Amino acid sequence: MDIKEVTNKGLKGCGCLSIGFFLLLIVIGIFAPDPDEEEVEKLKKELAEKVASETEQKDTVVVNDVLEGDPYQELDDLIGLGSVKEEVRSLANFVKLQKEREAKGLKTAKVSYHLVFYGSPGTGKTTVARIVGRIYKDLGVLKKGHTIETDRAGLCGQYVGQTGPKTDSVIVKALDGVLFIDEAYSLVPEGGAGNDYGQEAISTILKRMEDYRDRLVVIVAGYKNEMQRFIDSNPGLQSRFNRYIDFPDYSGDELSQIFKMYMKKNQYTLSKEAETYLKERFDYAVAHKDRNFGNARYARNVFEKSIQAQANRLANEKDLDKDKLTELTVDDLKGGFASRANI
């Protein structure tokens, strides 16, 4: 009985947790003392596709396939992030020119489409990753341009033999699009635990980046120092990731703009006094921020708490007109800024 026959029989009725262990048995040669390496690799891919199609991933794997609209316009419409927009535009221009040279039969420079995004939480890394995927589709780099968002929990298993198939199944979903790994540095804990499953996930990702070099773009993201440690931890990562984009924290004025963006989307307005108070409070938050400052997430949280404060204020009033229902006052904003979460 050959490896494939044993594998197919073993998969019938197997749960997701059993697949990784079964694959491990094959690899170490229990069923085939001298397995053909090419055959084993082929089976790994088939197993990953079975996991992807027949099982549910954890909540830490998010599919973003909204591909409508102009990605360049969406990039321009983002609040702040001037240097980020410039970097993405520069990358797009370079790729476009290389495609033109290729079409004319000229030599082309080698382009690495994989990216490192570093910056604090809430600075737009995930949003820009989605836009980059769509730009790559527009340029003909990717067929679909969708984004699969994940993190350590979405890639690593809890037991021996789970991580490889689990990581593979996420990669299969990302083919022809972008695999976005948030807090990628968590795959390499400080101190470099030798038996950590994160190392297995990295090895699998690097292998698939080579196998699917024309179908997969990987973007890794996280804090600057931690991401540098992550890249430096593995020569394979160093050779594949050589373009870095820095996402700066938002200014107080930019956070005010983000707050007002949520207001506009939800049909709210500010009183004149509240307008001044809003800017002062965001300036204060930026001046007193720590490493975990939430940036745009913080602005969204303040907005959500402010409209809750307004609802509490107006709950017992009668005959509410549109002005009262839409206007946020200083007292409402005080309720919004009351919590120091993510400051």
Residue ranges and their predicted role:
Residues 186-192, 200-248, 265-266:
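Canonical AAA+ ATPase core
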Residues 144-174:
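Short glycine-rich substrate-engagement loop in P-loop NTPases that contacts/grips substrate
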Residues 108-145, 172:
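Walker A/P-loop
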Residues 182-184:
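Walker B catalytic acidic pair
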